[in-house]
From Swiss-Prot:
Its EC number is 2.3.1.108. Residues 5-185 form the N-acetyltransferase domain. Pfam families: Acetyltransf_16 (PF05301). It catalyses: L-lysyl-[alpha-tubulin] + acetyl-CoA = N(6)-acetyl-L-lysyl-[alpha-tubulin] + CoA + H(+). InterPro entries: Atat, GNAT_ATAT, WRKY_dom. This is Alpha-tubulin N-acetyltransferase 1. GO terms for biological process: regulation of microtubule cytoskeleton organization. Keywords: Acyltransferase, Transferase.
Length: 329
């Protein structure tokens, strides 16, 4: 299929050429606050379509990249590569907790690296340097070296890609089908007395950048590779509005039962404390005084009403006390 027919199936995007990163929160913000001319709808359609194409190209049983999955896993993010206003590639990243075999100790260790969960460049744009542009943008934005990234079930083409551009070759086959290159273990040593990797085993990396300060990768220039410089796109995205202040509750109002109002047990305990204090002032030892019989909570509530007894008229018009049931005169 030609490049024109492939692109025709994708909606036009109002994004600059280059790489942008999206997570579930950023997509939700676009849908709510920045959906001019169906921009957010087209963006989500592009991510879903490229996710389906990635599934078909890799002969997978399920779609790995979709807007729904990004909403379910807020830690995952997708790097989207655009060219001439259309999405041409995606790279999905996320942190995973893995138990892998250490290449030197031949024992299982626990790590939680940033993982490549899905990587796809549209077939019409392959072998033109777009894949390296996308991968380099991810490494620069995350602050990682190529060997510090784990890959979920990489294809033969992906492994050849990593060997060609980053010299990643040596890895130990794992039962979970994740590929963790030996370079990942160069910086870390297991802690004594523990059968797993230390708590700080994950490489230092930057957090997900919010969409309002997203760095956009520069426009693709040639097949010689990117220049590894991000440029701030301050005019394309407006910052999200500040969070709304909490609602004001007027004094004396009760928002829900029990808020700003003491329970019967609290009233009973306060009455007990007042009685003990009174006995101390009288000079007696409260521990030697007889303990009064406990009072039920309903009696405390009834006593606290005092003169404000709840009244209810009968059919005959005679008022009675709804607590005692006696007529009122």
């Amino acid at each position: 299929m030609s490049s024109t027919s492939q692109v025709a199936l994708l909606p036009k995007l109002s994004l600059p050429d280059g790489v942008t990163v999206w997570d579930g929160t950023a997509l939700e913000y676009e849908r709510r606050c920045n959906n001019v001319d169906e921009h957010a709808v087209h963006l989500m359609q592009t991510i879903n379509i490229l996710g389906i194409r990635s599934k078909e190209a890799q002969c997978l049983n399920t779609v790995l990249t979709s807007v729904a999955r990004l909403r379910e896993n807020r830690q995952a993010r997708v790097y989207l590569l655009c060219q001439d206003g259309y999405g041409v590639g995606i790279l999905k990243m996320g942190v995973k907790k893995l138990f892998v075999t250490h290449p030197s100790y031949s024992s299982l260790v626990e790590i939680d690296p940033l993982c490549v969960l899905d990587f796809f460049v549209d077939t019409s744009f392959q072998r033109k340097g777009f894949g390296k542009t996308l991968f380099d943008a991810m490494l620069l934005n995350e602050g990682l070296n190529p060997g510090e990234v784990a890959i979920d079930r990489p294809s033969v083409k992906f492994l050849a890609f990593l060997q060609k551009y980053y010299g990643l070759v040596e890895y130990t086959p794992q039962s979970n089908n994740f590929v963790v290159f030996h370079r990942y273990f160069d910086k870390w040593q297991p802690q004594r007395g523990k059968g797993h990797w230390g708590g700080n085993a994950v490489p230092t990396r930057s957090l997900v950048r919010p969409q309002n300060c997203l760095r956009v990768y520069p426009k693709y220039q040639s097949t010689t590779g990117p220049n590894n410089n991000f440029e701030e796109d301050a005019t394309h995205r407006t910052p999200p509005p500040p969070p709304l202040p909490p609602p004001l509750v007027p004094q004396g109002s009760v928002t829900s039962p029990g808020v700003g109002k003491k329970t019967a047990y609290e009233l009973q305990y306060e009455e007990y404390l007042r009685e003990q204090a009174y006995r101390r002032r009288q000079g007696g030892d409260p521990r030697l005084q007889p303990v009064p019989n406990p009072v039920s909570s309903s009696e405390i509530v009834a006593a606290s009403c005092g003169a404000r007894r709840r009244m209810s008229p009968t059919r005959s018009g005679v008022q009675y006390n709804i607590i005692s049931g006696t007529p009122e005169h």
